[in-house]
């Protein structure tokens, strides 16, 4: 007779795992910050990956990496399809959770000590995050005011006018974030010709997408082509505070077509919204600053520990938290804890 398996009481992803996932990104950020400014992006990424993978092992869940460091044969850990979470006792099954990770967004930024490097994850119930291939994705990202106003097939000038109208501004008032890449030369020229201003960034279109959808960040939209995995993570964040996004995979080779089909995507030319990319009913998004940025402070070390700054958001419960944490590596002694 086969053993009867006991399934742990169903969990609320948002209620029961938010604190655990905040801890995961904090551990990755602390580890990668130790490599900041050392000029070795690979070492920075490896530090974040190892710390994140180890932190997952303490969580009572059957986690499934749906977006990670690459295919199984190309990544030693946090690869697509890897199972993460604590090993359950015999006869017990932990609840299943889909997880998307970018252990260190902006590896070059961390290696150079420049702003906006972050450690990121998103999680949902199974099926709540698109299994996106590791390819490029065309994106336009803006705030909640631009709901249903963006058209990825329309000219750049049309979308700029639409964004300006939604924000009650002139096009010349807008600041658009674009990745500084040769492939964006024509896009940059069109934005300038329309009269909008541009903020070029070296890396980090995920953090840029979040900033563009938040009021008071000084930017109004993101245009251009970046990574598809980062697009799904951005969509998870946007779902939590109703940001707007339209996107489409860039599938321009036979190899990519086959990879997209293997991942269950039947229409490679489909235009996605944030809801399409992150359709879950329960979504967690967590990001911890590595270097200082527009939204998050980087990790700050002191003699007996460090301080982290984390953005933690949930979709169903509609919560956006900025978590300021002091980590004490040992007894603080006579120093105590500094508030600011």
Identify the residue ranges that each predicted region occupies.
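General beta-strand structural signal in soluble alpha/beta enzymes
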Residues: 65-69, 99-101, 110-112, 131-132, ...
């Amino acid at each position: 007779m086969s053993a009867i398996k006991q399934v742990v009481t169903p969990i609320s992803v948002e209620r029961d795992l938010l604190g655990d996932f905040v801890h995961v990104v904090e551990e990755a950020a602390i580890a990668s910050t130790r490599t900041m400014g050392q000029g070795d992006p690979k070492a920075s990424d490896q530090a974040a990956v190892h710390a994140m993978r180890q932190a997952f092992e303490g969580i009572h869940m059957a986690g499934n990496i749906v977006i990670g460091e690459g295919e199984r044969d190309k990544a030693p850990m946090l690869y697509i399809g890897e199972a993460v979470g604590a090993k359950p006792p015999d006869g017990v099954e932990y609840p299943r959770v889909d997880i998307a990770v970018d252990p260190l967004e902006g590896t070059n930024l961390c290696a150079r000590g420049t702003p906006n490097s972050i450690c990121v994850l998103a999680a949902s119930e199974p099926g709540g995050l698109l299994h996106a291939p590791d390819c490029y994705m065309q994106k336009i990202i803006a705030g909640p005011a631009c709901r249903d106003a963006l058209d990825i097939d329309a000219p750049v000038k049309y979308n700029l006018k639409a964004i300006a109208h939604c924000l009650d501004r002139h096009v010349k008032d807008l600041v658009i974030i674009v990745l500084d890449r040769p492939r964006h030369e024509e896009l940059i020229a069109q934005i300038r010709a329309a009269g909008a201003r541009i903020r070029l960034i070296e890396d980090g279109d995920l953090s840029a997408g979040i900033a563009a959808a938040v009021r008071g960040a000084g930017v109004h939209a993101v245009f251009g082509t970046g990574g598809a995995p980062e697009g799904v993570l951005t969509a998870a964040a946007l779902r939590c505070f109703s940001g707007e996004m339209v996107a489409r995979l860039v599938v321009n080779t036979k190899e990519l077509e086959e990879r997209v089909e293997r991942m269950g995507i039947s229409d490679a030319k489909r235009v996605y919204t944030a809801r399409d990319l992150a359709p879950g009913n329960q979504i967690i998004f967590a990001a911890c600053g590595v270097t200082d940025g527009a939204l998050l402070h980087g990790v700050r070390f002191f003699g007996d520990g460090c301080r982290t700054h984390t953005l933690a958001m949930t979709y169903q419960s509609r919560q956006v938290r900025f978590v300021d944490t002091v980590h004490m590596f040992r007894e603080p002694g006579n120093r105590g804890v500094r508030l600011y």
